[in-house]
Swiss-Prot record:
It comes from Bifidobacterium animalis subsp. lactis (strain AD011). It catalyses: ATP + H2O + a folded polypeptide = ADP + phosphate + an unfolded polypeptide. Keywords: ATP-binding, Chaperone, Cytoplasm, Isomerase, Nucleotide-binding. Its EC number is 5.6.1.7. This is Chaperonin GroEL.
Length: 537
């Protein structure tokens, strides 16, 4: 495909136009009085959302240089969402602010490389200050307040706090559709591990790209499943029962994988294959954990079991298995509670005995997977569009609450960044363009507060001046239009969300400023309209 190339200021301005189009669309959602954005879909009803990363994903610009600029900001939102589960809009607003201020200085003659170094040093110092000032989460009420802010709904905050209280920090909270109106919370025992389906052809739910198996048989093996003969024998055993099959193995490849996929596509036999988690002895131990949880046996030649001669007695069972691209959740395994309790006691004893910090950490992970359980928040609403939007907000709020438990809380509403900057800036000594880069960060971090204020119908400049005069921890509560102690009022952000937003925004800003040429695909010419046909009259 032919390429088009732009250099210097023209390249940066083209990318900046794309960044602005995306950021201006996303930033209207920031804060408790932010607006929603309606996303048109090719099929089905439109989606209404205030989630930054969901909006960013839907924006695809026509101009190739604008598209590249927008894609870079999408990366900011996506990275922040991946790490912290929230803060995508804050990250986008910060990126826009840093890039605009940075480009002004580049045009004025500043060295882009030195500016980038200054931006990186200032953002690193701010992150250290944020982490040092974070307060640990100690109560269920703090979790509820954090989740409430993320979801914009007190009922959601209470449900998430209750769910995390039941499963613990290491437990799993999932969000599902509900046939009834409102929110329900169910708690089921289960296990989640970080391996997804081997092939996307196993997907049963195209919308969220997951494979959902109801009441499946589960085959656990420490070896590879490669031969067609083995997989046909396994399939014949399970097909007689009319139930789906989950295979957890070292790998599924050779003739076995296409055989499973073909039967899946034809609808002959529903199955899914995933790789076993871990390596070496740890993998064997985790497979044994799964076997105890599901009431099955690990098929291993060490135990004299071969795939071509097994029967149904070695298969485990579960009420449901949900497999995504990256992880697998086994809900309500069919193993006995006594066996699971004995296994948990055994792992706890191993934790007490080990002298290795690494081994202790891995044993604790296994314990959490085996004993943590799964909480399911079921979401129902008046319309499908509303249910989808609410479900998405709850998923973000769950990750937000977990981030708070993990690293602690700071005052919300963008205040933590401004107050951290006031402390860091006093003792920050850089020279030349590096100092200019740091100054870009110290002024750019005001952008989230200003946008929250403007979305609430107030002047951003007036609010930021007032916030700078307040004692530490106090700031602007946009929900009530008051200045108060934000921590006491429950207006908080997980420090993980705030620092991730800043780190990712600073990273992309540095890339923007140091871009000297952009190579883009040349747009295809529009197809000519079809010529009219002679009607034969």
């Amino acid at each position: 495909m032919a390429k088009i190339i732009e250099y210097d200021e023209e390249a940066r301005q083209g990318m900046l136009a794309g960044l602005d189009k995306l950021a201006d669309t996303v930033k209207v959602t920031l804060g408790p009085k932010g607006r929603n954005v309606v996303l048109d879909k090719t099929y089905g009803a439109p989606t209404i959302t205030n989630d930054g990363v969901s909006i960013a994903k839907e924006i695809d610009l026509e101009d190739p240089f604008e598209r590249i600029g927008a894609e870079l900001v999408k990366e900011v939102a996506k990275r922040t969402d991946d790490v912290a589960g929230d803060g995508t809009t804050t990250a986008t607003v910060l990126a826009q602010s840093l890039v605009h201020e940075g480009l002004k200085n580049v045009v004025a003659g500043s060295n882009p490389i030195a500016l980038r170094r200054g931006i990186e040093k200032a953002s690193d110092a701010l992150v250290k200050q944020l982490v040092a000032s974070a307060k640990p989460v100690e109560t269920k009420e703090q979790i509820a307040a954090t989740a409430t802010i993320s979801a914009g709904d007190p009922e959601v905050g209470e449900k998430i706090a209750e769910a995390l209280d039941k499963v613990g920090q290491d437990g799993v909270v999932t969000v599902e559709d509900n046939n009834r109106f409102g929110l329900d919370l169910d708690f089921t025992e289960g296990m989640r591990f970080d391996k997804g389906y081997i092939s996307p052809y196993f997907v049963t739910n195209a919308e969220d790209q997951t494979a959902v198996l109801d009441d499946p048989y589960i085959l656990l093996t420490s070896s590879k499943v490669s031969s067609q003969q083995d997989v046909v024998h396994i399939a014949e055993l399970v097909m007689k029962t009319g139930k789906p099959l989950l295979i957890v193995a070292e790998d599924v490849d050779g003739e076995a994988l296409p055989t499973l996929i073909l039967n899946n596509i034809r609808g002959t036999f529903k199955s899914c294959a995933v790789k076993a988690p871990g390596f070496g002895d740890r993998r064997k131990a985790m497979l044994q954990d799964m076997a105890i949880l599901t009431g099955g046996q690990v098929v291993s030649e060490d135990l004299g079991l071969k795939l071509d001669s097994i029967d149904l007695s070695v298969f485990g069972t579960a009420k449901k298995v949900i497999v995504s691209k990256d992880e697998t959740t086994i809900v309500s395994g069919g193993g006995s509670k006594e066996d699971v309790a004995a296994r948990v006691a055994q792992i706890r004893a191993e934790i007490e005995k080990t002298d290795s910090d690494y081994d202790r950490e891995k044993l604790q992970e296994r314990l959490a997977k085996l004993a943590g359980g799964v909480a399911v928040i079921k979401v129902g609403a008046a319309t499908e569009v509303e249910a989808k939007e609410r479900k998405h907000r709850i998923e973000d709020a769950v990750r937000n609450a977990k981030a708070a438990i993990e690293e602690g809380l700071v005052p919300g509403g963008g205040v933590a960044l401004v107050q951290a900057a006031e402390k860091v800036e006093k003792d920050f000594n850089l020279e030349g363009d590096e100092a200019t880069g740091a100054a870009i960060v110290f002024s750019g971090i005001e952008a989230p507060i200003k946008q929250i204020a403007e979305n609430a119908g107030l002047s951003g400049a007036v609010v930021i001046d007032k916030v700078r005069s307040l004692p530490e921890g106090e700031g602007f509560n946009a929900a009530t239009d008051t200045y108060e102690d934000l921590m006491a009022a429950g207006v908080t952000d997980p420090v993980k969300v705030t620092r991730s937003a800043l780190q990712n925004a600073a990273s992309i800003a540095g890339l923007f400023l140091t871009t000297e040429a952009v190579v883009a695909n040349k747009p295809e010419p529009a197809a000519a309209p079809a010529a009219g046909q002679d009607m034969g009259y």
